[in-house]
Amino acid sequence: MLDINFIEENQKDVEKRLNHRGNDFSKDLKFVVEKNKRRKEILVEVEKLKATKNQLSKEIGFLIRDQKNGEIEQIKNKIVQMDVQIVELDEELKIVVKEMNDVLAGIPNLPDESVVVGADENDNVEVRKSSHPNLSTQAEPHWEIATKLQLVDFELGPKLSGSRFLVYTGLGSKLVRVIADILLTRHTNHGYKEFFLPVIVNAEAMYGTGQLPKFEEDAYKTGDQYLIPTAEVPLTNIHANEIIDGNKLPLNYTSFTQCFRQEAGSAGRDTKGMIRLHQFNKVELVKFAKPEESMNELEKLVIDAEAILKLFDLPYRVIQLCTGDMGFSSLKTYDLEVWFPSQNKYREISSCSNCGDFQARNMMARYKDENNKTQYVHTLNGSGLAIDRLIAAIMENYWDGEKLNLPPVLQPYFNNQKFIK
């Protein structure tokens, strides 16, 4: 969440920058500032009462010495009344802080000043692109290719689990396993530490990365725990309530997990194929960095995700999201989009974000700087990559109408076979 003191000191500027996201947060900002003012007032009142109590307690000592019992009782009654007032103020403080934090939790991160102001995806800016995409009018959709080659069973998934589920079969299953290994090997060879994580987390972890309370309707819940929508959640929460040695920063983590999303609000979109699933496979990248280094680490993160698309020689582009298209916790985001010939357009395959200290404040993830001062760490995350979408893109870009030609990087895993037919 945002720093309430920063909001209080820069309310107009914060309001302006948040409005660039396309929503009016003025009422929320006014509410949290008022609650914070009352919070401070309560703390002052409590401190005054405690100071008066201490002074009266000292006076009782003198009165006992002078045997002034009548005055002693009067002072004791005053102290009892003050204790009641302190309890009442403490209870009010809890309510005020909860009300303030509940609203703060619904306010998104401030877009960085370098982010282009825009309303939606139409205002995003292309940063660079790779080779020219395949513009063939004969391109086949990946779900037809997958069915022909018996790599994916699109009927068995719904039979077992419902819509937006699928089953990889035979060489399709091997593709998932092999690609996950290739991705993890590349990232671990470039300084990322690998984790094999639980896919069920507690509410605190979801709150820490900003999935709660904003996106609860999109999460799968089991009891009081949640299935992860992305490995960003457990990876980033590794350092919740910790103080990291600043000399160890940046920290680079990676993990391959299955992810689970309700896809609330996606009715009618991408109902066929492997683009939008309730259960999907993804390799995630997470970084912890010093504030002054986080933007540079974001550029490195994009390069690390981009390297996978180069490895598979797929047409892609990098775009910078405008203010109106960025995620809730992000202050700056780049998307990597891969070319889908059958749709004649680029589709997102990775989103790389710098969240600044937004998540760290929720999680109390901090570090000691060179002056031994405790500061909030900056967190970054990105897909490296979404495996189901990567497989779909490989199918569409390497299909020649009769067989699926395998990218050179895959061939050693398939007995140097050059294609699947």
Regions found by a protein language model. Give the residues of each.
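TRNA-recognition modules of translation machinery and tRNA-sensing kinases, especially anticodon-binding
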Residues: S26, K129-K421
